[in-house]
Amino acid sequence: MLDNIKIRLHYLLPKQGITHLAGWFANKKAGWLTQLAIKAFARVYKVDMNEAKSPEFSAYITFNEFFIRSLKDDIRPVVSNEHQLALPADGTISQLGNIRTDQLLQAKGHHYTLEALLAGNHQLAEIFRDGQFVTTYLSPKDYHRVHMPCDGLLKEMIYVPGDLFSVNPLTAANVPNLFARNERVICLFETQFGPMIQILVGATIVGSIEMAWCGMVTPPREGIIKRWTYPEAGTTGAISFKKGEEMGRFKLGSTVINLFAPNQIQLAGHLSSGSTTRMGELLAQAIMLEEPTDNIS
């Protein structure tokens, strides 16, 4: 009963306005008030500051600086085997497994389609049909930078406007097509494991999504789909990443979805819905290796 009330209220909340206000406050240098907010947040959500490169609260002038805090060097070792992929973020596995034709599991009893997730891009959806997916939820206490599961060449980025529903387990289990209706940034990479997509999904109070190569993607929230394409490998302006390298960040946190083409990787057997993740640990193993190709347009 209480959960139903929470969901109904969430539909009614002015989520855009709340998110704008939260983003404004999170960037304010409000002195003692900022410190009070940071300490209260850390206490309520049991944030482990011992892992932070700057463990003292006083090191953070704004709430956003605290929220996107970096970790101590080498505290998240990245799997080094070239045939293995690394987890992209700290968090909890929401769902993972096979994309059954074009259906992804959101929560028990709830599915959504690849094409809806990819903003109606049928050509792109076909590449990942019958592939694998992993959805990772970043809770408020987690480290909120997102890293690369493997070496990759950036081919395309798509910004998709949308709702700003919370993406916690309660909403995932009760809001249909949650990840396909929320604001998101879709990043397509070419890798030695074939095409890979990494999606950063927005949510209520996520003030912004930033990428390593271009800075802030949202806001502004203009309500239109935007698309960027990037140069080929070896040409001026090409953007590539190494496994474990930071590629984006949330202010405040949300969800990361990874998509892999069929017959390329096998997800690690120890991972299941509810598994705790640490960036850099084992995500998957290669089924076959191939040289990066140029078959994505």
Curated annotation (Swiss-Prot):
GO terms for biological process: phosphatidylethanolamine biosynthetic process. GO terms for cellular component: plasma membrane. Its main location: membrane. Is synthesized initially as an inactive proenzyme. Formation of the active enzyme involves a self-maturation process in which the active site pyruvoyl group is generated from an internal serine residue via an autocatalytic post-translational modification. Two non-identical subunits are generated from the proenzyme in this reaction, and the pyruvate is formed at the N-terminus of the alpha chain, which is derived from the carboxyl end of the proenzyme. Keywords: Cell membrane, Decarboxylase, Lipid biosynthesis, Lipid metabolism, Lyase, Membrane, Phospholipid biosynthesis, Phospholipid metabolism, Pyruvate, Zymogen. The record marks 253-254 as: Cleavage (non-hydrolytic). It catalyses: a 1,2-diacyl-sn-glycero-3-phospho-L-serine + H(+) = a 1,2-diacyl-sn-glycero-3-phosphoethanolamine + CO2. The modification Pyruvic acid (Ser) is found at residue 254. It is a peripheral membrane protein. It is found in: Cell membrane. Catalyzes the formation of phosphatidylethanolamine (PtdEtn) from phosphatidylserine (PtdSer). This is Phosphatidylserine decarboxylase proenzyme. It comes from Photorhabdus laumondii subsp. laumondii (strain DSM 15139 / CIP 105565 / TT01) (Photorhabdus luminescens subsp. laumondii). The lineage of its organism: Bacteria, Pseudomonadati, Pseudomonadota, Gammaproteobacteria, Enterobacterales.
